[in-house]
């Protein structure tokens, strides 16, 4: 059977192992062909091809539910659930999403882009099933990296307390999340992964399953036949943690052996209780370059399939903001041993990998644990250290309570660097960094800032570290503007001080962060129409530079704000509140992201759809204020 002929996963039923292995090869071929052309997540999907095929042969997906954690692993799922022909449009505007999305397919039972949610969602579905008196199966597939997340452990703790609630958790253990996983649980899984194979069940488990009506007497024999794959369920140090938490543990299982996977999953479904199936896979399986560099090939831009090398862009790009941040922080750390860089499983993405390589004593990776990262930093700051927490804007949302309770209320000197702030592109609504201005502006004691270019990033970073209170510095995804940076001697900024970039009397444009460059381009368009704009680089949204902004606004009387974030509670709202509090009655036109979810597309396509390109903004300003050309 050909993969292209699959329109429904139930078509896998009845296929031989040999046929499934043939489809596995086709999935990898299609996966590699598309990702090498347009970019996307590579290693995770390649590692779960056999797991996906085996699992789906044991399920009826017209009824049964499967929740994939994060969605990095979801490409094989998409290819066998009717999206083969559309797969060329992966992560492109109006195309197939890079993550599972309920609105895209009835087989995407739960959407996700953030880690550690799958067990909670699948357990919720299982509880709903039991309350309705139905009998469909509920399965969560979670990676070993995501399993370190607190939410996943909370769900395991809850599920284990419900012994009569059938739930299968498949642990896809490839010893790798995005970066190598960290922590005691990861170390424990390493020990389990290399433990000697045992081919029999514990007496206690055999006795318990024999009591299951009708089928119980057959299960132990069926499990015994999974030769060389299932290791003893209750031997100390092999699955003991999960069994103590109320799960029946099965594994470790070879994750690329379809026949044994099918037997194991069928046996797990029959147990009718919480079961954890530990499957050991190889991230990037089937593509040697991805197997050899599992971090680098987690996600890739377009690359040459033959050499594995990225296809260089036609025009060289400036260094990314993330790298400038990492390089600058390294220099600061070398000068001050009290400065500590903290990341939550995103060392490479945030630029902190340079600390990991050069000064590991001043680098901490807490794993997928944003809440812990924030409060860890709070505790460190109490005793004289200077923590710098680098987290994607979208992931810091997960630690909102800690920002308030553990940092803001106590006014602790913790520096937060929010990477991927603003529009991020192809990862879609789960990853857009559009909310941080709004949610952080409400927290007392915080200073919020955003640079217009690389040089300001360096100055703001040293300002943050020197400030005796909490700060948040947002930086956009991707390349900088090509502005020269310094290796040392960065001049701290005055907190709350804005700057005038261009003088003008017809319109006042106050821009924040990444939108400053767009404001300058917009002003050029307006100037060609004989409209002279005064441009202010706000630098800070909290506190605002009242002494600069209010006199300018009072004089010019027409104000435009620009931000790459949600308008609700954002930078523009702060300006409106400033004027209202000071009884200044001046019209303010706010330009930013309206109350919508920003779908997957390139950043420029998203900005065009939102009306955030310079020519669009110039046109909006002219129409809003009825400016005479």
From Swiss-Prot:
GO molecular function: 1-deoxy-D-xylulose-5-phosphate synthase activity; magnesium ion binding; thiamine pyrophosphate binding
Keyword S-adenosyl-L-methionine: no
Top class in the EC scheme: transferase
Binding site for thiamine diphosphate: 72, 113-115, 145-146, 174, 287, 370
Binding site for Mg(2+): 144, 174
Highest rank taxon of the organism: Bacteria
Its biological purpose: Catalyzes the acyloin condensation reaction between C atoms 2 and 3 of pyruvate and glyceraldehyde 3-phosphate to yield 1-deoxy-D-xylulose-5-phosphate (DXP).
Entry protein name: 1-deoxy-D-xylulose-5-phosphate synthase
Classification lineage: Bacteria, Bacillati, Cyanobacteriota, Cyanophyceae, Synechococcales
Recorded name of the encoding gene: dxs
